[in-house]
Swiss-Prot record:
Catalytic activity: guanosine(1516) in 16S rRNA + S-adenosyl-L-methionine = N(2)-methylguanosine(1516) in 16S rRNA + S-adenosyl-L-homocysteine + H(+)
Protein family per UniProt: Belongs to the methyltransferase superfamily. RsmJ family.
Coiled coil: none
Protein name: Ribosomal RNA small subunit methyltransferase J
Gene name per UniProt: rsmJ
């Protein structure tokens, strides 16, 4: 993956070089995207649209922190979909981790969550946010214990895991593929900004249907797929049930009882 690699803190140039090596990133001064290491964090900027601001992972404050404190606990839709309302605390594999928000919610409710993010730039942002969260005095302990990023940014990561006899299968596989976004649908300013930047960097998950089969193979108890309310079922597979919210729904494919 080629994009601008910029270090704003001269003391961290070696760290940026390590990141580039780890995530197979190379510098391209003509790219519209810049991955910038500041003195505080790693962030993504769209150089030709500076008004969009920077995208970075913040699991401590902002909207994510607010949701952790006031988001409704095990009664919220994502928790019900994952089976937490059954009294279980399942192990979860988030196969489309993105900026880690949903994984963080599930981890804050007690679940051990392994995350796969196949795009190297997004994975680098998530890894940076995780490392900062691990140092936070309030949440660092359980973030370190419950959230793990699997360094597999290839498109066949789920396939590889499902065929790996040494990989411990999770109770639940959670998927939230990026869906092409109709212009007439309202989104919050933050989500709009992120979707615009991500869809131009990553593109919609046009091969998302291919995630369904390995997800079903991996999960021991259920697969949960988050979809916009207007979207079709993943891979045209009818779910066992759906939990609907105002703008989204969680399609649940049950394989076995949670208890």
């Amino acid at each position: 993956m080629q994009l601008q690699l910029i270090c704003e803190d001269a003391t961290q140039i070696d760290h940026l070089n390590d990141l580039a090596t780890r995530w197979n990133l190379s510098h391209d001064e003509n790219s519209d995207f810049a991955l910038v290491l500041t003195c505080e964090r790693l962030e993504l900027r769209k150089v030709d649209e500076p008004k969009l601001g920077a995208i970075f992972v913040d699991l401590v404050g902002g909207a994510v922190g607010h949701r952790r404190k006031f988001g409704g606990g095990k009664g919220q839709a994502i928790a019900k979909a994952a089976g937490l309302n059954k009294g279980a605390t399942p192990t979860i594999l988030d196969g489309t981790a993105g900026l880690g928000r949903d994984a963080f919610v599930l981890a804050s409710l007690g679940c051990k969550v392994q995350m796969v993010e196949r795009h190297p730039v997004v994975a680098a942002l998530l890894d940076d946010g995780l490392q900062r969260a691990q140092k936070d005095p309030d949440i660092g302990g359980w973030v370190s214990e419950r959230m793990k990023l699997i360094h597999a940014s290839s498109h066949d990561a789920l396939d590889k895991l499902s065929n790996d006899p040494n990989f411990e299968q999770p109770d639940v596989v959670y998927l939230d593929p990026m869906y092409p976004h109709p212009e007439n649908k309202k989104k919050s300013a933050l989500v709009k900004k992120e979707m615009r930047v991500f869809q131009s960097l990553v593109g919609a998950d046009l091969d998302a249907d291919g995630l369904f089969e390995p997800a079903m193979k991996l999960a021991t108890k259920r697969v949960v797929v988050k979809r916009p309310d207007y979207a079709a079922w993943l891979d045209e597979q009818k779910p066992s049930m759906a939990i609907e919210t105002k703008k989204n729904r969680f399609d649940v494919y049950v394989k076995a009882s949670m208890t």
